[in-house]
């Protein structure tokens, strides 16, 4: 896992899902001296997956950003190693594999496999989906179990994974996925100040349908 840096402020950024233009727009609005934490699922779904990956990785190499692993990155790593995508013998159903091709995907394999699972700040932690409440280890797919049982032990937990209409707060959990690839926004949250900066994601006519998630669980405040 990745520890806190010496930079004074951080911005935790929700699921990019191939929305490279939104990443560029967000970067224009965030101070160049602050550190960026991309909380996973940068790949799949959107129209500019390769561009988003290259841009984010460039920021990582510059020391400005951390890219956390999401379930989509883990699924691609698993698929490349076993030759199956979601139980099917063809990887062509994976958006990233289709966009990049086999050779380029395999060039990304080790980088994606070694992405950190969490970033620890002072009084807060960022991770993709939350923590397994039975072990309190990062879990890339957890939802309701973590939301219901989080006891505040890590301070604020800033997560992506579950899209909603705006940044939501739920008993010490801050949910920053605002559905960029679904016609919503790409949002960044500053855990030191509580500020939110959002830019438009895909235009509604180009976006994917929002998954059927329970609105009462997503609304927060």
Language-model region placement:
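Divalent metal-coordination and catalytic microenvironments
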Residues: 15, 36, 41, 70-71, ...
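A general structural motif
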Residues: 7-9, 33-34, 62-64, 122, ...
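Active-site neighborhood of divalent metal-dependent phosphoester bond hydrolases
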Residues: 45-125, 144-149
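Active-site-proximal beta-strand elements of phosphoester/diester hydrolases
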Residues: 10-17, 124-130, 174-176
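Active-site environment of divalent metal-dependent phosphoester hydrolases
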Residues: 17-22, 44-47, 72-78, 119, ...
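Acidic, His/Gly-rich catalytic cores of divalent-metal-dependent hydrolytic chemistry
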Residues: 5, 149-221
């Amino acid at each position: 896992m990745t520890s806190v840096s010496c930079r004074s402020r951080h911005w935790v950024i929700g699921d990019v899902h191939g929305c490279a233009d939104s990443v560029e727009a967000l970067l224009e609005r965030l101070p160049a001296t602050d550190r960026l934490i991309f909380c996973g699922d940068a790949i799949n779904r959107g129209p500019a997956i390769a561009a988003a990956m290259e841009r984010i990785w460039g920021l990582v190499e510059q020391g400005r950003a951390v890219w956390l692993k999401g379930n989509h990155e883990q699924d691609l790593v698993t698929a490349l190693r076993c030759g199956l995508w979601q139980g099917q013998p063809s990887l062509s159903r994976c958006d990233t594999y289709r966009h990049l091709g086999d050779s380029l995907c395999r060039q990304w394999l080790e980088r994606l496999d070694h992405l950190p699972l969490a970033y620890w700040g002072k009084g807060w932690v960022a991770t993709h989906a939350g923590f397994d409440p039975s072990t309190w280890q990062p879990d890339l797919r957890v939802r309701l179990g973590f939301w219901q049982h989080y006891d505040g032990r890590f301070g604020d937990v800033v997560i992506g994974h579950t899209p909603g209409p705006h940044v939501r707060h739920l008993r010490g959990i801050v949910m920053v996925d605002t559905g960029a690839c679904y016609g919503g926004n790409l949002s960044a949250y500053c855990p030191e100040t509580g500020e939110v900066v959002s830019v438009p994601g895909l235009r509604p006519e180009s976006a994917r349908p929002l998954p059927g998630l329970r609105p009462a669980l997503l609304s927060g405040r």
